[in-house]
Amino acid sequence: MSVTMREMLEAGCHFGHQTRFWNPKMAPFIFGHRNKIHIINLEKTLPMFQDALKYVRQLAANRGTIMFVGTKRQSREILAEEAGRAGMPYVDARWLGGMLTNFKTVKTSIKRLKDMEAAKEAGALDTMSKKEALMFEREMIKLEKSIGGIKEMGGIPDAIFVVDVGYHKIAVTEANKLGIPVIGVVDTNHSPEGIDYVIPGNDDSSKAVALYVRGVADAILEGRANAVQEVVEAARGGDDFVEVQEG
């Protein structure tokens, strides 16, 4: 699925922040301002978004993992939904410091959550006192909320996709430290520095956020489908029937 300029306009991707909050490093992507609000130049945004999606497609075709990060109220639900649709890990609650740089510790929490889920499935709650069962449920809910979206992630991701890079600067810093490429939606009040694939755009409107997140999820599914198609075609190519002329 390719995103059009019209869709971006309708989603309000071009609305930046109030001019007094601007970050001068975003100047190349700003068209002007209206009623003290910066207007983002979508003629810059669209090709940059397409570049990011091309990278996502290639990564997905090579079985890469892309972690979705968006914990603000307006992005949380759609982000979890679309990451789930694409079969990718996501962080939709608070970013825990060290989620990337200290993944070994996070892995311990993931194991704890999975063990608890298995225990519950096996009927462990029936053998507990009311108080123990309540404590168990509380811990499990807390773990599910903080790391449920990354529990199938075996190691650090190949890239992260961040909605609102300023709000998630710890995630961006951790990725930069580990050399993990960052795809990020950058509004007029933040800096594009440290972002490998910048998507200049509104990061506050739920419609705009839905457009970016769906676009990335679609690109992942397309990349995977293309990879499968190539494997099928290669297999077919190897079995071509060739008639040998006798002579």
UniProtKB/Swiss-Prot annotation:
Keywords: Ribonucleoprotein, Ribosomal protein. It holds the Pfam family Ribosomal_S2. GO terms for biological process: translation. The keyword Disulfide bond does not apply. One of its GO terms (cellular component) is cytosolic small ribosomal subunit. InterPro entries: Ribosomal_uS2, Ribosomal_uS2_bac/mit/plastid, Ribosomal_uS2_flav_dom_sf. The keyword ATP-binding does not apply. CDD domains: RPS2. One of its GO terms (molecular function) is structural constituent of ribosome. Belongs to the universal ribosomal protein uS2 family. This is Small ribosomal subunit protein uS2. It comes from Cupriavidus pinatubonensis (strain JMP 134 / LMG 1197) (Cupriavidus necator (strain JMP 134)). The gene is rpsB.
